[in-house]
């Protein structure tokens, strides 16, 4: 992808002051103990500034979504425009009392950190761990809509959806019921690939879909793998097997073909075409296979008994919830730095009914969420204004 110089103009949001978390994975906002600090120590709903921040970076891909931002430059935009559920201090340690704030020392100076929520972590006698989350009740998104726990739950379910293929890995945590929720659905691409090219059972997909998939593999998929082989052979590899091994895919047969190599890549990435793009030696996979087939990897298909919710995610109030893991996880608390994305913008409010296991979209269909990839909306310090090649 071309790395052309792009510009982002971000107008300051009136929703929150800088004492609130700036975005996913960012440090909690703070105020120093010294009078020279420029950070505010109290949260308010007044405008932070009437200025405009212009970002000029070379790595923008235009995926300014809290769910699908991939490049570091795109993530910079997310950090500025989104609220994080939890934040961290200057040492990277989590802030669990963000509502009232926590004071911590760093290099001889005391800093008080504020955030969007409090989190109490309890290790239970049965080995499970419960995270009691209490959200502030005075937060607003940049369009003036209130931030509630429903926005948090919606965001979690997007990250945990079986067809989610973004960079956030919350789906790998031991949340109670998550494995059952995800395993009750598979992607169309994975089902067809695992069935094999000679399959005759069309219970979960049509014969036409199967043919389209394997036609794409035999054409664009082979070309994708062959580009890697050509690159590796120009750098010392002698055949497909040695090229694949040099690329990190050991174990292919001595007489392996480019198709065998592509199948190994697909298996490695659970047949997520967007994830497989990481192995490109030149062309994007999306340029080599038909758009409708590419979408197979984000098309959910129910398999077995459908599981409608994640048992470990429980709403307890308009601004509170609990999340329970089956065991102590060193990464779970860091996953809670997730962005709180507005349900009313990224989801479908008519499809949100917590009591009836509906969470703002149809399970296995994130098309509505994906459609809002280029223009972010959140509750961070800035609102997104414009993205173009020139200076705004």
Q: How should these model regions be labeled?
A:
Residues 34-55:
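N-terminal low-complexity, Pro/Thr/Ser-rich intrinsically disordered segments
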Residues 21-34:
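Bacterial lipoprotein signal-peptidase II cleavage site
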Residues 90-93, 274, 278-310, 318, ...:
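Gly/Pro-rich hinge or "lid" segments in bacterial periplasmic/extracellular proteins
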Residues 49-59, 129-134, 152-155, 320-323, ...:
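Short, well-ordered beta-strand elements
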Residues 1-11:
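Bacterial Sec-dependent N-terminal signal peptides
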Residues 16-20:
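Hydrophobic core
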Residues 117-282, 322:
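Aromatic- and charge-enriched surface segment that lines or borders ligand/interaction sites
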Residues 56-126, 377:
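N-terminal lobe/hinge region of extracytoplasmic solute-binding protein
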